[in-house]
Amino acid sequence: GTFDKGDKPLAGVMVTDGMNVVKTNKKGRFSLPGFEKTRFISMTTPARFETQQFYLPVKENRKSYDFLLTESERTQPREHSFVQITDTEVTGGMGRWVTDLQQYVKNEKPAFLIHTGDICYEPGLKMHNQVVNAETMNCPVYYCIGNHDLVKGNYGEELYESIYGPTWYSFDIGNIHYVVTPIDHGD
């Protein structure tokens, strides 16, 4: 990988192609053996850090996948809270719940917010990405695919992945390793 001035490599960061998992070396580098169905290279965001992008889409001629991590006090505490939401269907629009959620997050200051599925088909997937994200919530936001998020295509999760990235991933907060996995089937 390449580093900007002042950036330092980080050893021990877990990186995966969806099948294989490796750790970065002391120079912050990694090598994956290759998995032909890989759609993303993603990393486990380590405790003490935040990132704007924990995954990168695989591109045919791309040889390097670099992730930018910034230190964050929010993801360090051993004891922390998080906000979990689910089934926030958007029939008739977002309504007042988004404003209420923003206020709740502002008051409680959770380490992160996670949406555990049923973002609700194409309209919901697109709308949530615009209104429930790290910038609008002022904390890291993670998404997990639900059965109402699988839409027609070669893979039911194609639209979800084009907006939110891989359906399998993990991150660390304090001394807890969180693993996000998809449901096994849709409607």
Predicted regions and their residues:
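Structural motif
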Residues: 1-11
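Cofactor-binding loop segments of dinucleotide-utilizing enzymes, especially the Rossmann-like FAD-
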Residues: 1-2, 87, 118, 146, ...
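Extracellular/periplasmic catalytic domains that process cell-envelope and extracellular macromolecules
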Residues: 9, 34, 75-78, 106-107, ...
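Short, solvent-exposed loop/turn elements at domain surfaces
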Residues: 24, 91-95, 151, 187
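N-terminal active-site segment of His-dependent metallophosphoesterases
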Residues: 35-127
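Extended active-site neighborhood of metal-dependent phosphoesterases/phosphodiesterases
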Residues: 44-57, 61, 126-187
